[in-house]
Design a protein with these regions (language model features):
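Intrinsic low-complexity, intrinsically disordered or marginally ordered coil/linker segments
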Residues: 1-192
Length: 192
């Protein structure tokens, strides 16, 4: 999950400082079995004044950055996205606005609360050879799939999904595939 915070600069610097100090410690605040034990989300939960047994915090953070007026980091977690950690951050820092983009391949969800695309503009993940990529519009997706299958596709969701279905039915090459995932735009409170 990728996360961005905007809002009160003092609160942003406070959160950034806590996370930076946690990841720069010689030993983790709380002993744990994670690969990056100092960046375990449970350390942040404890630093924010809550018992790590009360908040789902299975995972770590990475790529912590404070640039201009935006604090950002990524999380890697198992079983589910760490939305409860974000809820705790919002409780401790109520003047920060949280934007996220969460992908759960194993959970088969693609979520964002960034309606305007301020930080996370991608609305589609297109997985097909040679690699997967992200697109902001259905027009871009239709153009890319059309180039892959060798024909023009009307830039609508219905036409794109119909072209994918037709390709899947007629394609015999096991190395040729098209998987399209669409990000659902949700309110932050909906994921809690």
């Amino acid at each position: 999950m990728s996360v961005c915070f905007v809002g009160d600069r003092r609160q942003m610097r406070s959160l950034y400082g806590k996370m930076l100090r946690l990841q720069n410690r010689k030993r983790p605040l709380v002993e744990n079995g994670f690969y990056y034990p100092k960046r375990w989300l449970g350390n942040l939960v404890v630093r924010l004044g809550t018992d790590c047994q009360e908040v789902y915090c299975r995972g770590t953070w990475d790529n912590l950055r404070l640039e201009k007026s935006v604090l950002s980091f990524c999380t890697e977690s198992a079983w589910q996205a760490p939305f409860e950690v974000l809820q705790l951050i919002q409780k401790v820092y109520p003047r920060l606005e949280i934007f996220f983009s969460a992908i759960g391949d194993g959970w088969d969800f693609y979520l964002t609360n960034d309606k305007e695309g301020r930080f996370f503009s991608s609305r589609f993940e297109l997985d097909m050879p040679p690699e997967n990529d992200y697109y902001d519009t259905i027009e871009e997706v239709a153009e890319r799939i059309g180039a892959y299958i060798g024909r023009d596709i009307e830039p609508s969701k219905e036409a794109v999904y119909a072209a994918i279905d037709e390709f899947d039915e007629t394609n015999e090459d096991m190395d040729a595939y098209i998987n399209l995932k669409e990000f659902e735009v949700v309110e932050f409170w909906e994921v809690l």
